[in-house]
């Protein structure tokens, strides 16, 4: 329970992407820049979808293993600024919305007042394969999707206990003579509070980075439905898969991508954050059809971040967006 508490407090809590006035100035700046990059990415995808022919489905799929809400927040901001597209998070309902994988197969059309014309509105599907901080498990069959304006009250527990680094050192120093509870000097009240925290934490519909990450039936169902959807999309003709920030260490997703490479018209781009990442990914999935884009070295300015990724895919005339990068098989 202690580890889950520290994981939420130090990592997962940031995934809500709230912009608070009392946050550190550098953190607020980084979040604004990140949100802006997400907006630019989505806006460019919408523009690209709009160029599709009349007989093509105007839809793009974003598969992600991230829990955070940057895609949702960026899309909301674009929609409020009148960018015309449908953002589909897979949920269906009005006041209460539930996740339904079949919702990713829908399209929306705009029709003229006198039915003289109609056109398909671009759709972006966001398929969150490992769940989201905006999801809650209702029961063994349902996941509720909602977007809170504040952190979950029942998870906002402030305990006077060691941070994770201090805890590791304490356990290492006293593991031969003390239990973990004794090493961390946890009181009975601390243990009780951690148990209550864990009960609320387990209501989050996310895949935890543990060996037992798919033990919940409801999440097994969602995950494998997502895999089938990914496989189906990659088997379509003239498909482009762009991988950014993905290590290929999820063996199920890696296997789907590996099998899909038999599709003769599939194009796969893999963006590597560091120079060494290409060889690390190559050890996991090695195919001559994969195009790697990676830094020539790890000097400042050559790292791949979201802004650089956008510049490379949607290059601007007059700007050499590939400077310092290598594009190879």
Q: Each predicted region: which residue ranges?
A:
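Active-site periphery "cap/insert" segments of enzyme catalytic domains
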Residues: 1-122, 126-139, 221-235, 246-257
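Short N-terminal helix-initiation segments at or just after the protein's N-terminus
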Residues: 1-7, 61, 65-72, 174-189, ...
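Short, surface-exposed amphipathic charged segments that create phosphate/polyanion-binding patches used
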Residues: 101-106, 141-148, 304-316
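Active-site-proximal helix-loop elements at catalytic-domain edges
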Residues: 17-31, 197-216
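Glycine-rich loops and low-complexity Gly/Arg-rich segments
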Residues: 87-89, 150-157, 266-269, 294-295
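SIR2/sirtuin-family catalytic core signature
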Residues: 116, 167-197, 209-329
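Conserved beta-strand segments of alpha/beta enzyme cores
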Residues: 61, 125, 205, 289-291
């Amino acid at each position: 329970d202690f580890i889950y508490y520290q994981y939420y407090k130090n990592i997962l809590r940031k995934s809500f992407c709230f912009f608070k006035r009392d946050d550190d100035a550098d953190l607020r700046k980084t979040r604004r820049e990140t949100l802006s990059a997400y907006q630019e990415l989505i806006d460019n995808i919408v523009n690209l979808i709009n160029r599709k022919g009349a007989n093509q489905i105007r839809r793009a799929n974003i598969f992600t293993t991230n829990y955070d809400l940057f895609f949702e927040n960026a899309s909301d901001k674009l929609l409020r600024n009148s960018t015309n597209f449908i953002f589909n998070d897979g949920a269906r309902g009005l006041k209460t919305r539930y996740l339904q994988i079949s919702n990713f197969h829908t399209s929306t059309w705009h029709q003229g007042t006198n039915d003289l014309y109609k056109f398909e509105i671009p759709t972006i599907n966001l398929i969150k394969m490992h769940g989201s901080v905006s999801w809650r498990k209702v029961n063994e069959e349902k996941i509720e999707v909602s977007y809170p304006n504040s952190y979950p009250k029942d998870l906002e527990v402030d305990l006077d206990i060691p941070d994770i680094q201090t805890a590791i050192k304490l356990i290492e120093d006293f593991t031969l003579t003390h239990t973990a509870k004794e090493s961390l000097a946890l009181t009975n009240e601390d243990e009780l509070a951690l148990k209550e925290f864990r009960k609320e934490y387990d209501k989050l519909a996310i895949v935890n980075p543990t060996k037992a990450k798919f033990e919940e039936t409801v999440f097994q169902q969602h995950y494998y439905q997502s895999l089938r959807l990914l496989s189906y999309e990659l088997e379509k003709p003239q498909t482009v898969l762009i991988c950014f920030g993905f290590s290929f260490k999820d063996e199920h997703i890696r296997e789907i991508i590996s099998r899909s490479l038999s599709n003769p018209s599939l194009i796969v781009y893999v963006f590597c954050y560091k120079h060494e990442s290409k060889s690390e990914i190559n050890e996991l999935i090695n195919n001559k059809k994969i195009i790697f884009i990676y830094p020539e070295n790890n000097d400042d300015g050559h790292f791949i971040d979201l802004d650089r990724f956008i510049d490379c895919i949607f290059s601007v005339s007059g700007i050499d967006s590939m400077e310092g990068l290598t594009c190879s098989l």
